[in-house]
């Protein structure tokens, strides 16, 4: 199964960030489907204000991915922040936030 970037529907397009997402991109155990996402993020983008009011003012979802280009700073509620850069695979557990240090492409 494959999909080209331009064929993934845009679900959010604001200055500094474009999010693309497609559901049903593979099956998970228990009958659930996986979604695939592609983010194009501009330097200086910080999602923390969008997360205010959520539990611990952070993202509650887990994320696995790969940084194609750029650099992100990940802040965790219960751990030191870390830098994720081009070529890195990542896992972000619940209760994190990100800000973009360098223009980034992330899947």
What does each of the following model-derived ranges do?
Residues 57-74:
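Short, conserved beta-strand element in jelly-roll/cupin
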Residues 76-96:
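Short acidic-glycine-tyrosine-enriched beta hairpin
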Residues 1-49, 55-56:
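A short, N-terminal "cap"/entry segment at the start of jelly-roll beta-barrel domains
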